[in-house]
Curated annotation (Swiss-Prot):
Keyword field contains Membrane: no
NCBIfam families according to UniProt: minC (TIGR01222)
Taxonomic lineage from the root: Bacteria, Pseudomonadati, Pseudomonadota, Gammaproteobacteria, Pseudomonadales
Record keywords, A-Z: Cell cycle, Cell division, Septation
Top-rank taxon: Bacteria
Protein name: Probable septum site-determining protein MinC
Subunit-level organization: Interacts with MinD and FtsZ.
Region of interest called Disordered, as start-end residue ranges on this chain: 109-142
Free-text function comment from the UniProt entry: Cell division inhibitor that blocks the formation of polar Z ring septums. Rapidly oscillates between the poles of the cell to destabilize FtsZ filaments that have formed before they mature into polar Z rings. Prevents FtsZ polymerization.
Pfam families: MinC_C, MinC_N
HAMAP family: MinC
Basic and acidic residues composition-biased segments: 112-128
Length: 250
């Protein structure tokens, strides 16, 4: 081994878990022409949202009696509008086969990911001597993350395990993420995603709602929908009821 070579047992990579906010595009029917037109309308309303946005194509709600979808064509339409397909979610055999043919990862249908696993039964072992139960672990409480400076376009701020408070304004193209609630005391013009690990009780509080997108536990509204709300530009709170986002005055 030359003096400049690194020993082979020195690790050159690490595998790390990560939580990313990924948009899911759920198709209700196989109609790529209509999809192209409707995506173009969405892009016109919130262009910053459709800028190299990672995407999962959800095909598991397509009717079983509809023909096979043109998956490469669907991906081209998404790419044309700034959406970068990472994987599909599918249950129909023809959709899964089409994804495998182009080396695109296939995720299980939405319900399958939430189904509890049933462990294999194990052979009965001799019962050990009883031991006193361990003291319950103290729950990990993460402090609220507070940002006192303006959040500029292109910035992404994440409050892991807690709430996020921004005392200034949030510019277009900026992104706020929190496992808990999000509070913005300035103008909210970027994207706010609360409860991103599935907390349906999370809320978003804004003193001036002019956001590109708001989302709670994966349910979202984009600028086009928000502008039609009579509380656009006002102080509001956003909450989730079932799969419906509710916007009410503060």
């Amino acid at each position: 081994m030359s003096p400049n070579q690194t020993p082979d047992n020195t690790p050159v990579f690490q595998l790390k878990g990560s939580m990313l906010a990924i948009t899911v595009l759920e198709l209700a029917r196989n109609d790529l022409e209509s999809l192209d037109r409707q995506l173009a309308a969405k892009v016109a309303q919130a262009p910053n949202f459709f800028s190299n946005t990672p995407l999962v194509l959800a095909l598991d709600k397509l009717p079983a009696d509809e023909g096979a979808i043109d998956l490469p064509g669907l991906m081209r339409i998404c790419r044309h509008h700034g959406l970068r397909t990472l994987a599909i979610r599918a249950s129909r055999i023809e959709d899964i086969a089409a994804a495998i043919a182009i080396d695109l990862p296939v995720l299980p249908p939405s319900g399958a990911r939430e189904r509890p696993l049933e462990p294999e039964p194990e052979a009965k072992k001799p019962e050990p001597e009883p031991t006193p139960p361990p003291a319950p672990a103290e729950p990990e409480v993460r402090p609220t993350r507070i940002i006192t400076s303006p959040v500029r376009g292109g910035q992404q701020i994440y409050a892991q395990g807690g709430d996020l408070v921004v005392t200034g304004s949030v510019s277009p193209g900026a992104e706020l993420l929190a496992d808990g609630n999000i509070h913005v005391y300035g103008a909210m013009r970027g994207r706010a995603l609360a409860g991103i690990k599935g907390n349906t009780k999370a809320r978003i509080f804004c003193q001036q709602m002019t956001a590109e997108m708001v989302s709670i536990a994966g349910q979202y509204k984009v600028c086009e929908d928000l502008r039609r709300d009579p509380l656009w530009g006002s102080g509001v709170q956003v909450s989730l009821s079932g799969d419906v986002l509710n916007i009410t005055r503060l």
